[in-house]
């Protein structure tokens, strides 16, 4: 044991060497961002799938007591519980004026998150996604969930992010299990 971990006062009182014990903890602040630009989606059904994916991820994080910062277009929130988060998700509507660089607006509100989830549609190109994640801190983990109604689930790892294709909401538990 390192001498810096010796609790000298307790050691002097007890007459034997007392070592500090630390509990391993890791705070995981999570930023959840969904693209609300309808140009990123094939149709309204795909947009609704994206909203459902976004909502499911947020609820899971909140149930695990992980702090969440949620972003949808110009709306930014720090929900305290799953009900509050789902209420916010019920108001997510398409917005053609949404900033295509989701990371830029996310970083304005959650610059120190350790985990970034971006939910986009299948029309968001891989080049756009790669450009988007460049701004994120290297120490953070980034997962891009691409809603693509009817497509087979898939996971592809890149150097700075992981891309998961979600063709059906029922695919999400398996995808998240692989990513865990």
Annotated model-derived regions:
Residues 1-180:
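Exposed, interaction-prone extracellular/peripheral surfaces
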């Amino acid at each position: 044991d390192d001498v810096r971990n010796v609790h000298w006062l307790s050691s002097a009182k007890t007459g034997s060497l007392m070592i500090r014990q630390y509990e391993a903890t890791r705070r995981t602040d999570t930023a959840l961002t969904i693209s609300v630009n309808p140009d990123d989606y094939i149709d309204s059904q795909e947009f609704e799938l994206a909203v459902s994916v976004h909502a499911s991820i947020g609820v899971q994080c909140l149930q695990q007591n992980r702090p969440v910062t949620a972003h949808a277009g110009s709306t930014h929130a720090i929900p305290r519980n799953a009900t509050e988060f789902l209420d916010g998700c019920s108001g997510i509507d398409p917005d053609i004026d949404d900033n295509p660089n989701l990371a830029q607006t996310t970083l304005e509100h959650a610059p120190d998150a350790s985990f970034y989830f971006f939910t986009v549609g299948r029309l968001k190109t891989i080049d756009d996604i790669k450009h988007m994640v460049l701004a994120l801190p290297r120490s953070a983990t980034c997962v891009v969930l691409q809603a693509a109604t009817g497509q087979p689930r898939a996971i592809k790892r890149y150097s700075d992010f992981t891309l998961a294709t979600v063709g059906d909401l029922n695919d999400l538990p398996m995808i998240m299990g692989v990513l865990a």
